[in-house]
Amino acid sequence: MTLKNRFFFFLLATCLISMKCAAQALPGGRYSAKDKLKLEKQQDSLKLFAFNIVNGEEPGQRFRADSVFIRMLVRSLKIPNSFYFPFDSLQTISKLYAPDSSFRIFTWQIKKDVYVFLQRGAIQMRTADGSLKLIPLHDFSMFTKRPYDSVRNANNWIGAIYYRIIQKNYNGKNIYTLLGFDDFTINSNKKWMEVLTFDEQGQPVFGGPYFSFKNDSAKISNKPVDRFYIEYKKEASTTFNYDSSLNMIVYDHLISETEEPKRQETFVPDGDYEGFTWLNGQWLHVPKVFGNTMKLDGQFPQEQKILNDAGGVDESLLKQPPEKKK
């Protein structure tokens, strides 16, 4: 399977999950039948441009599609109560509702060339009167040497395509943890764990003192960590998701397959899992979640396939937590 196809199925799986969450989370807000027809018509137009953002053969095609898509999306979202319209036909765009339905976040990426991927994003807030409150997110990743040790806003966001939102509450404050994917370089990918809060003016704040590495050595640096990521070999499959039964974010422990620990593009799963558990308003790092898990034949465990034998997306697999190794 090509990298483009793998990315497409990653987004498709994200869309299926977000559709299920939206159906469960959204309250009784409604758009009129007339506005529904408008939104459906807009969605039909948006589909082509959303597809070409990812699949356009030339950079110019992709960037033109991206520019038109953004303008059309904003026009669509200005339709009253558009917040409740799922845009579920836009399969190359991630759309996630917060568990409390207070906002949703759109994210996607555009390929400049084989070396550079840019992320796009916007947060749509739910409003009482159905009007549009939209906060564009500007990807600042390529201008940042140390993306993990700074609190940021919408204008200097560390871009990612989000596939999960976990909501916690501490001292009366809602804290949202975003899990996201970044097609980082030609040789490696990243998966991000980003904490999102909102300030008194309702503006997004990304990052903060929400990570604790007390009594372990897994920390990215000796300085405070305001967000967390793993970087790994482009062809590797990695787990990085929330397990509600454990109240933990669980992810693969990585090692260099070439014994070069400073080259993260050589990192692959070794069969062990690490994680973070929520405790007293912070994500506390857990160095080892399950027991030793290396397969007897020395092969690295592979992430469960999302596609079934017929080539369709197996939704039941999307709902399963990482398998606990014996």
Predicted region positions:
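Beta-propeller fold detector
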Residues: 133-141, 205-214, 285-291
